[in-house]
């Protein structure tokens, strides 16, 4: 993905399970399971996502693998700044491959070409006045960067148990079907 953030949830042991099955529609059951997992993670991530105007929160999506049977679900956001909200920036980030360099918010230019702090419009919406954007930028620079918000990774970590339980239910239902227990 060129812009945005994408985290993949992969099913361990899935290939072994598929090889042992011929009589069951594993693809359909797995697709329903992964779609449900995607919805679950998206719902939790939207609750955790930082909100300014709601663009990041509303952009969180999930997409199930298109191959048959599906093996993963992607959950992410195509908003350009999503990775920086997830991992943080500067010296405070927790991304495994980004350099630890102090983050100093850049300067944008307004319609007339005058320099305006990148956070000026945010500060104005929050009622902090003209100097508010500069004060926020200064605080970010002093701290070294934005702190990680972990809205996606935190959701996956907290839901790991529920996802595992659901996968066991799907797996056991398939096993019962194969053993002659009928539809599960």
Where are these regions (language model features)?
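Short, Lys/Arg-rich flexible segments
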Residues: 1-184
């Amino acid at each position: 993905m060129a812009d945005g953030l994408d985290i993949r949830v992969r099913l361990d042991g899935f290939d072994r399970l598929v090889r042992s099955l011929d009589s069951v529609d594993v693809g359909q059951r797995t697709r329903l399971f992964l779609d449900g997992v995607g919805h679950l993670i998206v719902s939790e991530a939207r609750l955790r996502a930082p909100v300014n105007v709601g663009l990041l929160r509303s952009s969180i999506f999930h997409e199930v693998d298109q191959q048959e049977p599906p093996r993963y679900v992607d959950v992410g956001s195509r908003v350009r700044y999503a990775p920086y909200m997830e991992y943080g920036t500067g010296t405070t980030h927790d991304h495994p491959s980004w350099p630890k360099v102090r983050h100093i918010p850049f300067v944008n230019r307004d319609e007339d070409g005058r320099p305006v702090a990148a956070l000026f419009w945010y500060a104005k919406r929050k009622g902090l006045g003209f100097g508010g954007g500069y004060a926020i930028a200064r605080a970010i620079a002093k701290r070294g960067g934005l702190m990680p918000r972990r809205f996606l990774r935190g959701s996956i970590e907290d839901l790991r148990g529920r996802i595992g339980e659901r996968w066991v239910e799907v797996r056991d239902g398939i096993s019962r079907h194969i053993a002659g227990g009928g539809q599960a």
